Amino acid sequence: MNMYQLLERTAQTYPDNLYLVREGVKYKDFIDLVKARAASLDKAGVKKGDVVGILSHNIPEFPISLFAIWYLGGTVLLLDTNLTPFEYDNMAQITECKLVCAEKAFVYKTDKFEFYDITKKDGKVNPDLKPAAVESLDIATMSFTSGSTGMPKVVPLTHFNIVECTNSLESMAEWIRPADILYGFLPMYHVFGFAVEILATLHFGAGVLLQPSINPKEIMADFKIFRPQVIPAVPRLWEVFRNKIIDNVKAQKKWWLVSFVLKYGKTLQKIGLGALVRKVQKPILDVFGGRARLLIAGGAATKPEVETFYERLGLTFIQGYGLTETVGPICISKPTKKRLPFAFGGPTLNNECEIRDKNEDGVGVLWLRGHQVFGGYLNNEEANKEIFDERGFFNTGDMVSMDKNGELHFAGRKKQVIVLDSGKNVYPDELEGMFITIPGVKNVAVFEHRVKDKTVTYGVFSVEDGMTIEQLGAEIANANKKVASYKWVTHFAMTTEDLPLTSTQKVKHHVVRQNLINGMYPDRHE
């Protein structure tokens, strides 16, 4: 089965379910829009085997063009909207992409490829244009994972990989139902947004409410009007939502009551005070529209206190793990009473894992094998030899451990692990998760750095206006007491500027480190 056939199956099963919620487009109508776009692209010269780029925010024409390209048997090059013309030109050359479906705001003069206006109105469906004969092992998408200049890594994913990922999402059937509304503000060019906004909706016959903006006012208005049942977001956004909710409650001088009810809600319900619990929860749940059932986090580890906050509101909170190389979610947690903080579950259907080279703490490198794992980077045999073993297992480069329940825990990227002069390993994610709870700290990057010919664990902190280097130092010293002394951060810099982030709100550690070297963070304690 290929991806267009999967769309056809969903449209036949749920023809009258809304797919594009804001636009009121049902699955049966979406099929016609795809066929009309396919006819337009066919006239533009797109044929089976061609690589066609999509450069767009989350607008309806994105999924319409996506499936239209697949209808014609093409490969979709998913392009990050935050790059430069030079990078797009290079990407097109590497992948032999000759046409890019783009919003007008991204169009520029180039001789590397042609632009196609993604918002252009399509004509009628061409009844003579049939779906291309696409095999399951044909390449469906390409994405860049390590930059677009120098020696980039391009991830080709087959229709088989993506269909299998879609099928594996059945593990979420307890929480996602046909006709649910899934909020879609994660960029669809990124594998997390692609997996939940395209694949999950397709599998369950659910609808997606696309939102091209990350403006909080627009998002809150959407929650109020459309009342989505499923909301995916990166952990950083879940933390921002939580903090704003708490600040609003404190401003009303009601935090003492809310915090008490959230902490003892189950006990209060058992003694007949369920009405009080619901009364306290309701205005908070109304922030998300009042119908939210499932919150999904991915792209990084979620702090336990953030996850606990939402679960005490009666919401189901799921943590997933995945990479571009695995079509996103290849591990999904299941919320149970036994589940430990930071757990992101185990491999999904038809996938398996091994943890190799464990240290004394049980932390080792995660290797994966299965139907969702890609076949190797495009035209990069050297890299492929390094990441695949003779048994077909893929080296993720991520450090994980397994708890007593058999669930995995993220410890950090192997390439970001700090190796001290003593030989001890320090995992930045562990320390960042600890430091981010310091009042006044907006974000933090921990990495390896040389100070006076010594390898140290260095931290760069983004803080609120008014915090002094002395105050921050005292908070860091207090936090350090929670971990072994060799992990302590005693060298750090402070800035009131935001740290550079990726499109999925992850800190760009390499950029922060280079900024430090370039003297951009003068407030230092070394």
Summary of predicted features, one role per range:
Residues N126-F144, M151, W175-I181:
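Conserved pre-ATP/AMP-binding loop-to-beta segment of ANL
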Residues L20, A44, I64-F67, Y71-E135, ...:
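Structural core segment of the AMP-binding/adenylate-forming
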Residues I231, L276-L408, K414-V417, L431, ...:
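Conserved AMP-binding/adenylate-forming
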Residues D16-G45, D50-I59, F67, T84-D89, ...:
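Conserved AMP-binding/adenylate-forming core of the ANL superfamily
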Residues V100, G370, G375-G376, M399-S485:
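AMP-binding/adenylate-forming catalytic core of the ANL superfamily
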